[in-house]
């Protein structure tokens, strides 16, 4: 996966720089979301892997599947990816583009996992505290995992804050083994 991300990075950067210069970050993000979803479809993967189709034919089919959701510049981007045999990288390109967009807009998605459903006011307080700590606008998504026993686990990017009872018990067990 790291290799695919490395291959996707220059394409994501080029798309981001173009979208930023054209003041179309959201439009490009939405187009990449659609394109990545199309590229992830099993039938599309098989069609892209078929050697019987030329790069131009693959791009044409791909653009047709996306329909009117891509403007001319975005279609050209798809054609460039097809000519370089990189259409399969679209999910990685979308992810890298999303990170660059979030960095530019100073936003971050935070996943909060708790043993039980958290009250809305607690989620709002948590969002405010994280926003102040991270100096970003925070978008909180919550989920439930009963195996945590209590507390919360917060995921943001590559950072994990484990405030769960299960995590504390694991640390205690590790300390007792030492």
Curated annotation (Swiss-Prot):
GO molecular function terms listed in the Swiss-Prot or TrEMBL record: proton-transporting ATP synthase activity, rotational mechanism
Main localization (coarse): membrane
Source domain of life: Bacteria
Any one of the GO CC terms: plasma membrane
Membrane-topology annotation of the record: Peripheral membrane protein
Subcellular location: Cell inner membrane
Database matches in InterPro entries: ATP_synth_OSCP/delta_N_sf, ATPase_OSCP/d_CS, ATPase_OSCP/dsu
Gene3D superfamilies listed in its UniProt record: N-terminal domain of the delta subunit of the F1F0-ATP synthase
Keyword Cell inner membrane on entry: yes
UniProt keyword terms in alphabetical order: ATP synthesis, Cell inner membrane, Cell membrane, CF(1), Hydrogen ion transport, Ion transport, Membrane, Transport
Keyword Translocase: no
UniProt-listed Pfam families: OSCP
NCBIfam families: ATP_synt_delta, PRK05758.2-2
Subunit note: F-type ATPases have 2 components, F(1) - the catalytic core - and F(0) - the membrane proton channel. F(1) has five subunits: alpha(3), beta(3), gamma(1), delta(1), epsilon(1). F(0) has three main subunits: a(1), b(2) and c(10-14). The alpha and beta chains form an alternating ring which encloses part of the gamma chain. F(1) is attached to F(0) by a central stalk formed by the gamma and epsilon chains, while a peripheral stalk is formed by the delta and b chains.
Known function: F(1)F(0) ATP synthase produces ATP from ADP in the presence of a proton or sodium gradient. F-type ATPases consist of two structural domains, F(1) containing the extramembraneous catalytic core and F(0) containing the membrane proton channel, linked together by a central stalk and a peripheral stalk. During catalysis, ATP synthesis in the catalytic domain of F(1) is coupled via a rotary mechanism of the central stalk subunits to proton translocation. This protein is part of the stalk that links CF(0) to CF(1). It either transmits conformational changes from CF(0) to CF(1) or is implicated in proton conduction.
PANTHER family for this protein: ATP SYNTHASE DELTA CHAIN (PTHR11910)
Family to which the UniProt record says this protein belongs: Belongs to the ATPase delta chain family.
Protein name, as recorded: ATP synthase subunit delta
